[in-house]
Amino acid sequence: MKINLKLMENNISRSDIISVKKFLNKKKIILTQSKQVEKFEKNWSSWLGVKYSTFVNSGSSANFISISILKTLNKNKNKNEIIVPTLTWVSDINSVIMNGFKPIFVDINFSNLSMKIDEILKKINKKTLAVFLTHAQGFNGLNDRLLKILKNKKVHLIEDVCESHGATYKSKKLGNYGLISNFSFYYAHHLSTIEGGMICTNDKKIYEMSRMMRSHGMLRESKNPKYESEITKRYPKLSPKFIFLYPTLNFRNNEIGATIGLNQIKRLDSNNKKRILNFKNFLKNLDGNKYFVDFDLKGSCNYAFPIILKTKNINKRNYFEKKLKSKNIEFRRGNAGGGNQLRQPYLKSILKIKNFNKFKNVEHVHSFGYYLGNFPDLKKEKIIKLTKFLNSLDIR
């Protein structure tokens, strides 16, 4: 009998569709970025606990704009390195490269799939501008030691919280600790606007820059009349409505995406509680002799069930995948972003790293790590059925 587990189900609910219909039935509506976007940004800021949020068309765009802001504000051009994880989404690395920085890669922990903090600290030097830390799969990647040293060395922290909405460190939501934090609202994430992302900060200048960089670099998007007046006087031969300060593109979202976001945020906390409970039930019933189960759950808010096989046998791995397919269980090998980014073609001409043994943990996850779907509607009975099946497989 098939188990039939997808990576995500029912993430756009009937309630979301009704909210969109209600919005579209209004007599006078604007579909491009307008009041719904502003309201969603305010509600998200309130939920997260930050001063400012900027709604964009994807988490990847949020990443790109954040690093573009760092580049613009960076006055010491000798600081041209940004420390990044080997396990992350491709846009984190590409945002660094496309803005002219050198990515410095760090291996991960099995316990939270985030960067090894000792390795981060070893790689900080005079050239380090920032640490771009991914909170993967709903796990927290921070500790006090890292935060203290980054502050003392004046190294910026950028948080990628795309997969970890609602996860916390010391009871404060992730996304509150960095100079800038980024979120994705892609279909399978904790909150979805189908496609979308958010840039969050407590810094007013960065907020204004994010608004401008979201929209072609246009001055009039800054939402700062005094600043706009000052710049307009500086460029008297330009139309005040068409002054472009930064070399960027259009990353705006729209009113329909914001309407879905406004409806989804109402149930985000309750959905997150279900995800957390699902993950605990999954780990409780999973065979620790065959699979890694010692994850750090403190403050976590699970995005998808991580599976790390203990075996290093490729034949066992292939058998495992064949069995999952036979039960119609959807999976992704390599976990977040497909595994070790250093193995991807886009980096071949940029970095000449051939010795992957320096990154042992991500190498194992690359070949023997997976994630399976976890979502609020997933029933405990199906989780038990899933773990019984996984435990029955001959992969030791």
What kind of region is each of these model predictions?
Residues M218-I231, N281, Y319-K358, H364-Y370:
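Conserved PLP cofactor-binding pocket of PLP-dependent enzymes
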Residues M1-I30, L245, G373:
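N-terminal "arm"/small-domain region of PLP-dependent enzymes with the aminotransferase-like
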Residues S184, N302-N313, L342-I353, S367-K379:
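Conserved PLP-binding active-site segment of the aspartate aminotransferase-like
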Residues S111-T193, M198-E208:
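Active-site phosphate-binding strand-loop segment of PLP-dependent enzymes
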Residues F64-K123, A130, L324:
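Conserved PLP-anchoring active-site segment centered on the Schiff-base-forming lysine
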Residues S164-K170, Y177-A304, G338-G339:
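Active-site region of PLP-dependent enzymes
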Residues I30, K35-E81, S95-I97, F105-D107, ...:
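Phosphate-binding glycine-rich loop
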